[in-house]
């Protein structure tokens, strides 16, 4: 199922974004240029995640237009993963903001 594939890719992008921002924070003082690169990579991964998330939303909306509401089980799973992904995305964005605010 394509939505499962997209959800897995969203998870990967979030994990990568988190890893990059944590590296950026870790190396900010000792290696500022490399830390900035890690920050930029974290931003890029979040951009990928947002594109994938939008695609999931588009697929659900297309399903609604063509055949009506998706099965309840599918929507329950989507809502669970959506909440999980948005929580992780918020935590990453907070860390990205902290990185930019640190002197």
Per-range role (PLM):
Residues 1-103:
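Non-heme di-metal
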